[in-house]
Amino acid sequence: LFPYTTLFRSYLVDQQMLEDLRTERFNTHASNLGAILANEFAEKYHVPAFIVDPVVVDELQPLARISGLKGIHRRSVGHALNQKAVARKIAEDLGKTYEQSNFIVVHLGGGISLGAHQKGRMVDVVNGLDGEGPYTPERSGALPLVEFAQWILEQELTISQVKKLIAGNSGLKSYLGETDLRHIQAQIAAGDQTANYYLKGMCYQIAKSIGEMAVVLEGTIDAIILTGGAAYSQTVVQEISQKVTWIAPIKVYPGEMEMAALYEGVNRVLTGEEQALNYSEAKIEQE
């Protein structure tokens, strides 16, 4: 994953960035390949390469960094590119700008992340990659710490195995052996009560995390936005919405705007609306 920077928007790909990604300096994630692949094309065609709103955009307010244990800090990890793109779109639909709006954005995919977007900044997140918040189709979300620590010791797991477990082999996959919501909903339609139970449990936990983000925004919320691939599921949308409609209006934007967001971010640089940031000069927070 990209390092945690206090700046956001678009970065020019440089050698320091490529080195950090190739050596997995901060973490292992498929998105690490983005800048590396972009650089291959950039060198071939003699043009600059950029990244836009990487998954570790860090705009956290100071209190949001506190974990509860000295020496461990909360990290800002979420689907920032899609969250911010969809938030801009919904703000436009409401006749406002992103910088004038307050949103809770819920990205529903194999991983689930939530962001509290306050006047153009993602001031707090529910970081599903590191084991916060709801369980997802393939991630654990928050776990009982003592029981999990005991289980790690008993199974003699390495840190690499733990990461793969909580971010790839947990959630619905561990309960049902399935991550595809279409298949799970077909099982439910056929009368599978176990599948129904765990899908509802996931939606219950997502709704709880939405409530958490509502507190961050002190109840001043223009909309709760549900996006990502799982937002195509009417079952998931309804299960979540019925629990949180009292907080703010629900806006559903299924799928992702990530390709359009990449274009729009770089276009803002090329037209002079924004200036590309220099990764090597950015403030980096170490692990």
Regions found by a protein language model. Name each.
Residues 1, 50-53, 104-109, 117, ...:
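Short beta-strand segments
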Residues 221-240:
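Glycine-rich phosphate-binding loops at beta-strand->alpha-helix junctions
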Residues 231-232, 238, 251-287:
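Glycine-rich phosphate-binding/hydrolytic loop that grips phosphoryl groups
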Residues 9-10, 15-85:
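Gly/Ser/Thr-rich active-site cleft segment
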Residues 8-9, 60-65, 115-119, 127-128, ...:
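Short acidic, glycine/serine/threonine-rich loops at helix termini
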Residues 2-7:
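Short, small-residue-biased leader/transition segments that mark boundaries at the very start
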Residues 164-218:
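Adenine-nucleotide phosphate-binding core of ATP-dependent small-molecule kinases
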Residues 35-39, 51, 66, 71-102, ...:
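Glycine-rich phosphate-binding loop plus the immediately following alpha-helix
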